[in-house]
């Protein structure tokens, strides 16, 4: 590079002050400057006629680029410099060439001005001024710019303006097509489906969110499928290990790399925790392993000095007046039912039972003649779990139950801390998995996944704690959760809209399932179940002079006897209710086996009939256990931003707790107003759940009324046309539902207590028509100018009430004109599938989920839990968490 070229490069690095408003003149100047370069090239090429490549470039017109801009004169200068270097010209000749170019520029500029017409004459003065500027400052002339240097600023500015114009044209094209970006939308959300997200204008032409790898759940699933690296290693490059050098131990028998095959049902364990027992097993097993929900702890390990509930007390035959009144009402209902079905009731049946039981004496059975003796456990040196805990004597052990109603038993008085409860949960699960049937050692837990069944109205804090225990403490590969009612439909093979009634040991849960979703506002949890029936049945037996008068119902052997009697004798079959002779064997620790004979009459039906009179259960409970320490350590879940309770808030649960049931209203107008106001109550529950009802209040609503409440709210909040399907598909499951003829009496009770308005087959059409007319009134109402806002609202409400009364009278007239029972929704109770225990249907449904491909998207791995925490449940749940 010459010295002059170096100096010119220094000038181009400095900022240049060039006016940008004369773009047209500058374009013209570029064309003019290109002409002398071409003429100079003609002169040089005349001397070298053998160079054909240069001849092709020579012309009277400057070639154009793709963008329509003139070819940069510096490119032509580059070619000239190369030719000059090839001829080995010295620096003096280069200086002469530059001077010749200046002369040619002036000559060619004058020639071009003469050839152009009058239209170009108008633009001549600016061009002349520009050429004069280049003469005054020759180093600013683009034609003299050295090769490979910066582009002039006026060209950069022109390109920028071109890009702005292109963006405007692109925006016009998007608007014409209809895919432009809209910041706000005024269209309200309608229907059951959420509106689609607006297109991302930035990435609309790319593959953004169009591949499975760009979706979190699918990307994580693919990673787990193809995971050939150790999860412990944090690097992407696996370590090179010599397999021959590894020790042949049990721990190394597992695959070196923790591969997770999410679609392998043999590597999945299904767990359904219940109040009475835990159902656990592999998905392909015919039946799960049923482990009693019991942990026997030696009394010497516990501080029970200040506990008044330790000693077992006998049931008192004498009860309160309120108890006797409810019992009299139940007996009256029983006699009316027997009379309706033409069953004869002996007048002196109760006297016959009492006289026989008073004179009944026990028969001693020797140990060798006992068909099923019990080997009681007296060794209090360790803990016992499951069925072994049931054989521990009460004098040396305390029975703790870590689960209640599908969640942690925070009401148990025997737990001092949450750590004790979690310890019992982990040890009980390890005991169940280590049984002979499953034979899964704790060291192999990391090779299995878990499908966990949770209640319909679940507590988020309990679910999250349970998942954390399974992933971090027991170290399973992954965990997926499913609600009980949905699992019930899977297990029973029902795909239509269904009302599921699950009668458990401690709780009874009701929920409606529609299109694979548990409807939130239909879920109800009743705080009574099979254990309450057992206790009440034992009390009725004692009031009939049961031979075993010192019966300690709270002792372990006393409770086992009561459970056995309830299972064998309670029934709803009218034909089986008579004065009959029965017998049983009493097995107690340190006592010989005794055989008793006794008689029963209506006690076999009165005890389960309390499902429809549940207030009597509240009167026979010894005390409402409450462990404030555990409730403080495991509080209810709250929103991180608003600090409001964020558990599921069911409208049916709230109304049944407060006693606001449709079946208790005799006026159809009140029922209709309550139904129309349901959406407002739902909004209030979601905004301020603490202000509406006590969450700790127990729910003792009658079973048949709760079912009607659940179906009505499910139909109103989701689709009112589903009401007929819900009444036609009522599925009863649970261990305490195995009472003969329960479906028969439940159908009668629903037909008796269901309001006439809600039982009409024309109610869905009536409700849809009424709501449409109310919306029309609200939309077309014109406020009076001389009235205040409150007065206008009162006028509108008066018109709405008038319309409701008018439509209701028309509905009553239509019902009266119909004949027979064709206008009434039929009630149908679906029996469990043949040869299937109703207590195991929920577990079976969860095992079905574990074998379908959908479960791959629901599994939560340990890495997911570490990174996202409980937020991962919002993305990997089959329901709205």
From Swiss-Prot:
Amino-acid positions noted as binding ATP in the UniProt annotation, renumbered to this chain: 502-505
- Quote a single Gene Ontology cellular component term: cytoskeleton
Question: Where do the segments described as Disordered lie?
Answer: 1-150
Coarsely, its chief localization is nucleus
Compartments where located: Nucleus; Cytoplasm, Cytoskeleton
Coiled coil regions in record: none
Q: Which GO terms describe its biological process?
A: chromatin remodeling; DNA damage response; DNA repair; double-strand break repair; mitotic recombination; regulation of DNA-templated transcription
Q: Which GO terms describe its molecular function?
A: ATP binding; mRNA binding
- Residues the record lists as Phosphoserine modifications: 65, 70
Q: Where is the composition biased (Acidic residues)?
A: 14-33, 44-54, 77-114
What SUPFAM superfamilies does this protein map onto?
Actin-like ATPase domain
Q: Which UniProt keywords apply?
A: ATP-binding, Cytoplasm, Cytoskeleton, Nucleotide-binding, Nucleus, Phosphoprotein, Transcription, Transcription regulation
Stored InterPro entries: Actin (IPR004000), ATPase_NBD (IPR043129)
Q: Which domain of life is it from?
A: Eukaryota
Q: In which family does this protein belong, per the annotation? A: Belongs to the actin family.
Miscellaneous field = Present with 1010 molecules/cell in log phase SD medium.
Q: What is the recorded function of this protein according to its Swiss-Prot or TrEMBL entry?
A: Probably involved in transcription regulation via its interaction with the INO80 complex, a chromatin remodeling complex. Exhibits low basal ATPase activity, and unable to polymerize. Strongly prefer nucleosomes and H3-H4 tetramers over H2A-H2B dimers, suggesting it may act as a nucleosome recognition module within the complex.
Quaternary structure, per UniProt, is: Component of the chromatin-remodeling INO80 complex, at least composed of ARP4, ARP5, ARP8, RVB1, RVB2, TAF14, NHP10, IES1, IES3, IES4, IES6, ACT1, IES2, IES5 and INO80. Exists as monomers and dimers, but the dimer is most probably the biologically relevant form required for stable interactions with histones that exploits the twofold symmetry of the nucleosome core.
According to UniProt, the name of this protein is Actin-like protein ARP8
């Amino acid at each position: 590079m010459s010295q002059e070229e170096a100096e010119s490069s220094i000038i181009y690095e400095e900022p240049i002050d060039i006016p940008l408003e004369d773009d047209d003149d500058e374009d013209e100047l570029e064309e003019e400057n290109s002409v002398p370069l071409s003429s100079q090239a003609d002169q040089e090429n005349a001397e070298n006629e053998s160079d054909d490549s240069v001849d092709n470039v020579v012309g009277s017109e400057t070639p154009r680029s793709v963008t329509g801009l003139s070819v940069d004169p510096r490119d032509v200068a580059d070619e000239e410099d190369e030719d000059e270097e090839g001829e080995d010209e010295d620096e003096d000749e280069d200086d002469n060439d530059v001077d010749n170019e200046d002369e040619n520029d002036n000559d060619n500029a004058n020639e071009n001005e003469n050839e152009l017409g009058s239209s170009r004459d108008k633009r001549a003065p600016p061009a002349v001024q520009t050429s004069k500027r280049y003469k005054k400052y020759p180093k600013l002339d683009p034609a003299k710019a050295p090769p490979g240097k910066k582009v002039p600023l006026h060209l950069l500015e022109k390109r920028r303006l071109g890009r702005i114009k292109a963006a405007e044209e692109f925006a016009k094209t998007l608007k014409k097509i209809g895919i432009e970006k809209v910041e706000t939308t005024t269209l309200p959300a309608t229907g059951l489906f959420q509106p689609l997200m607006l297109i991302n204008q930035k990435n609309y032409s790319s593959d953004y969110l169009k591949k499975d790898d760009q979706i979190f759940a699918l990307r994580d699933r693919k990673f787990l499928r193809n995971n050939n690296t150790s999860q412990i290693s944090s690097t992407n490059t696996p370590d090179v290990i010599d397999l021959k050098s590894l020790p042949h131990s049990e721990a190394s028998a597992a695959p070196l790399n923790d591969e997770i095959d999410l679609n392998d049902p043999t590597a999945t364990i299904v767990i359904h925790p219940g109040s009475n027992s835990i159902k656990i097993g592999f998905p392909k097993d015919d039946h799960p392993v049923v482990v009693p929900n019991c942990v026997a702890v030696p009394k010497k390990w516990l501080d029970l000095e200040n506990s008044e509930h330790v000693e077992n007390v006998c049931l008192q035959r004498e009860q309160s007046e309120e108890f006797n009144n409810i019992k009299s009402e139940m007996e009256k209902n029983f006699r009316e039912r027997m009379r309706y079905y033409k069953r004869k009731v002996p007048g002196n049946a109760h006297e016959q039972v009492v006289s026989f039981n008073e004179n009944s004496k026990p028969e001693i059975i020797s140990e060798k003649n006992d068909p099923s003796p019990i080997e009681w456990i007296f060794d209090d040196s360790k803990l016992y779990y499951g069925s072994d805990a049931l054989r521990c004597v009460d004098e040396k052990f305390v029975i703790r139950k870590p689960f209640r109603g599908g969640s942690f038993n925070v009401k148990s008085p025997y737990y001092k801390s949450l750590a004790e409860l979690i310890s019992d949960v982990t040890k009980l699960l390890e005991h169940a998995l280590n049984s002979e049937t499953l034979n899964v050692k704790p060291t192999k837990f990391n090779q299995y996944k878990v499908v966990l069944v949770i209640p319909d109205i679940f507590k988020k804090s309990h679910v999250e704690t349970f998942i954390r225990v399974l992933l971090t403490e027991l170290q399973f590969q992954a965990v997926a959760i499913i609600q009980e009612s949905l699992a019930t439909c899977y297990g029973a093979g029902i795909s239509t809209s269904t009302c599921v009634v699950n009668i458990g040991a401690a709780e009874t849960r009701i929920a409606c399932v529609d299109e694979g979703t548990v409807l939130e506002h239909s879920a109800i949890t009743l705080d009574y179940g099979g254990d309450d029936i057992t206790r009440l049945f034992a009390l009725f037996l004692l009031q009939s002079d049961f031979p075993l008068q010192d019966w300690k119902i709270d002792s372990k052997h006393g409770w086992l006897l009561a459970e056995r009697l309830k299972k064998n004798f309670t029934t709803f079959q009218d034909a089986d209710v008579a004065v009959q002779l029965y017998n049983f064997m009493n097995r107690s620790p340190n006592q010989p086996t005794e055989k008793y004979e006794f008689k029963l009459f209506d006690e076999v039906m009165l005890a389960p009939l309390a499902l429809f009179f549940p207030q009597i259960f509240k009167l026979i409970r010894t005390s409402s256990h409450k462990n404030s320490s555990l409730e403080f350590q495991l509080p209810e879940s709250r929103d991180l931003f608003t600090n409001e309770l964020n558990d599921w808030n069911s409208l049916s649960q709230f109304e049944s707790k407060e006693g606001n049931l449709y079946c208790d209203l005799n006026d159809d107008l009140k029922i209709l107003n309550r139904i129309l106001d349901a959406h407002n109550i739902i909004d209030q529950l979601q905004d301020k759940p603490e202000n509406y009802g006590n969450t700790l209040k127990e729910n003792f609503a009658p079973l048949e009324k709760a079912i009607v409440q659940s179906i009505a709210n499910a139909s109103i909040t989701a689709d009112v046309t589903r009401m007929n399907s819900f009444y036609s598909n009522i599925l009863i499951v649970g261990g305490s539902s195995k009472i003969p003829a329960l479906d028969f009496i439940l159908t009668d009770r629903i037909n008796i207590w269901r309001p006439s308005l809600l039982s009409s087959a024309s109610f869905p059409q009536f409700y849809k028509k009424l709501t449409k007319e109310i919306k029309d009134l609200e939309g077309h109402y014109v406020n009076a100018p001389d009235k205040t806002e409150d007065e206008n609202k009162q006028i509108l409400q008066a018109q709405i009430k008038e319309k409701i009364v008018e439509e209701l009278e028309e509905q009553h007239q239509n019902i009266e004109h119909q004949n027979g029972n064709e206008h009434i929704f039929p009630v149908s109770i679906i029996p469990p599938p043949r040869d299937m225990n109703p207590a195991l249907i929920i577990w079976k449904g969860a095992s079905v989920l574990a074998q379908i491909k959908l479960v791959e998207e629901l599994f939560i791995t340990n890495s997911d839990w570490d990174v996202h925490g409980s937020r991962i449940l919002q993305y990997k749940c089959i329901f709205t968490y």
